[in-house]
Amino acid sequence: MAGCVPLLQGLVLVLALHRVEPSVFLPASKANDVLVRWKRAGSYLLEELFEGNLEKECYEEICVYEEAREVFENEVVTDEFWRRYKGGSPCISQPCLHNGSCQDSIWGYTCTCSPGYEGSNCELAKNECHPERTDGCQHFCLPGQESYTCSCAQGYRLGEDHKQCVPHDQCACGVLTSEKRAPDLQDLPWQVKLTNSEGKDFCGGVIIRENFVLTTAKCSLLHRNITVKTYFNRTSQDPLMIKITHVHVHMRYDADAGENDLSLLELEWPIQCPGAGLPVCTPEKDFAEHLLIPRTRGLLSGWARNGTDLGNSLTTRPVTLVEGEECGQVLNVTVTTRTYCERSSVAAMHWMDGSVVTREHRGSWFLTGVLGSQPVGGQAHMVLVTKVSRYSLWFKQIMN
């Protein structure tokens, strides 16, 4: 009997424990709450330790402005991001052209272009020339079947990327030393005066090849014996004088209408580059009319008339393109495909015939216009010029 007592006591203890609620262990629902709270507290601690993660805060989840501000730590950048973030899906507007596919991202969208197209919005055909290209040809561009081809102005050759143009000749056109690139240039190596047999200056001209000067047809027919004169880079007071051996007036020059008012003057001997002068570049048609003239500011340069004489100092003025219709109304002229107009915002001047308009593009200066006789009574702050790019074939026929 005594041996049964411990057995009975153990049985009673087991029954008692079975009726007691196991408070050491929580129910599943409460246990999950504890786990969730602990997990959130842990992630919050990590977020405090590390910089804000934009993708986690605003892409995987919906963020508030303050969370984005913690990531950028800059109000301007945050505001820019917030405008895009709250603007909705950019791909809804179908920004990717030519059947490109659009993918939303935290910063906006990304386009995957169809074969043959490129650009941020697939807007550029790979075989075409576009002025908008930031990585396109430095000078001239020719479209092809699968891709475009680059070429360069006189005295340059293509670089290793087949896009950049590298000067390889001492007479490479349009190159200025770094200290003479400012738009208020007072001494341009391609600008020359024309002088008659009596030593009187009567017109201006511009060197476009070391042995050719371009001027107006009217100027070239004023005198029989013409000499080109330049003071560029002269150490003495005496100018460099070179005689003209041949005058090439454009075959379609119309003196009455003033059309095709251009003439090429062939020099007796070539100018020694770069010390005595330097040619300016002559642009191809598409390059000039789609990029140079409409997209860059021009520089009008020449000598102003002081009565019947020309001033001693070369004058330069910044100019911009004027639409043909406006120019035609102001100057009472017909603006053709071979002419265009420039406007200067500074005081009016009486420019001599043969003054020129040049434009700088990526380190090279290009000739875009030559001034002829201006309309009577026209406003001197606006000038009509001959569009040089329309005559590139004629230049090649004469000079080559």
Swiss-Prot record:
One of its GO terms (cellular component) is extracellular exosome. Pfam families: EGF (PF00008), FXa_inhibition (PF14670), Gla (PF00594), Trypsin (PF00089). It comes from the Eukaryota. The iron and 2-oxoglutarate dependent 3-hydroxylation of aspartate and asparagine is (R) stereospecific within EGF domains. Residues 1-23 form the signal peptide. The modification (3R)-3-hydroxyaspartate is found at residue 104. Disulfide bonds join 58-63, 91-102, 96-111, 113-122, 129-141, 137-150, 152-165, 203-219, 327-341. Keywords: Blood coagulation, Calcium, Cleavage on pair of basic residues, Disulfide bond, EGF-like domain, Gamma-carboxyglutamic acid, Glycoprotein, Hemostasis, Hydroxylation, Repeat, Secreted, Serine protease homolog, Signal. Glycans are attached at residues 93, 99, 225, 233, 306, 332. The keyword Disulfide bond applies. Plasma. Its main location: secreted. It is found in: Secreted. Residues 24-40 form a propeptide. The modification 4-carboxyglutamate is found at residues 47-48, 51, 55, 57, 60-61, 66-67, 70, 73, 75, 80. Residues 87-123, 125-166 form the EGF-like domain. One of its GO terms (biological process) is blood coagulation. The keyword Transcription does not apply. Residues 175-400 form the Peptidase S1 domain. InterPro entries: Coagulation_fac-like_Gla_dom, EGF-like_Ca-bd_dom, EGF-like_dom, EGF-type_Asp/Asn_hydroxyl_site, GLA-like_dom_SF, GLA_domain, Pept_S1A_FX, Peptidase_S1_coag_factors. Residues 41-86 form the Gla domain. GO terms for molecular function: calcium ion binding; serine-type endopeptidase activity. Interacts with SERPINA10. Appears to assist hemostasis by binding thrombin and promoting its association with phospholipid vesicles. Inhibits activity of the coagulation protease factor Xa in the presence of SERPINA10, calcium and phospholipids. Belongs to the peptidase S1 family. This is Vitamin K-dependent protein Z. It comes from Homo sapiens. The lineage of its organism: Eukaryota, Metazoa, Chordata, Craniata, Vertebrata.
